[in-house]
């Protein structure tokens, strides 16, 4: 195997996780309040046209785990855009 089978990235704010082609495998989002994030296939300036996945939590559903049955192929890069602020929690992006 030439590289890692998966990489993990943890944060709670907007971030460019990876530049260049990759595959999104999963997302975990947790917070004690309402929060949301979107994954975009870009390296900056996320827009509706390059959004590939959106994940949300609420005050009654504190954690969302999305493990994709088939990875989403990203060509430009993997950018996380936090929509509703993540107050006390965090997200974890799983990619390769």
Where are each of the predicted segments found?
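Surface-exposed, low-hydrophobicity beta-strand/loop segments enriched in small/polar/acidic residues
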Residues: 1-96
């Amino acid at each position: 195997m030439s590289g890692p089978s998966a990489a993990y990235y943890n944060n709670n704010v907007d971030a460019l996780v990876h530049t260049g082609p990759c595959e999104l495998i999963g997302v975990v989002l947790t917070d004690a309040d309402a929060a949301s994030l979107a994954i975009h296939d870009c390296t900056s300036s996320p827009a509706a046209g390059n959004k590939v996945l959106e994940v949300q939590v609420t005050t009654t559903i504190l954690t969302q785990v999305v493990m994709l049955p088939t990875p989403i192929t990203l060509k430009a890069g993997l950018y996380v855009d936090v929509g509703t602020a993540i107050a006390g929690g965090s997200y974890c992006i799983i990619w390769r």
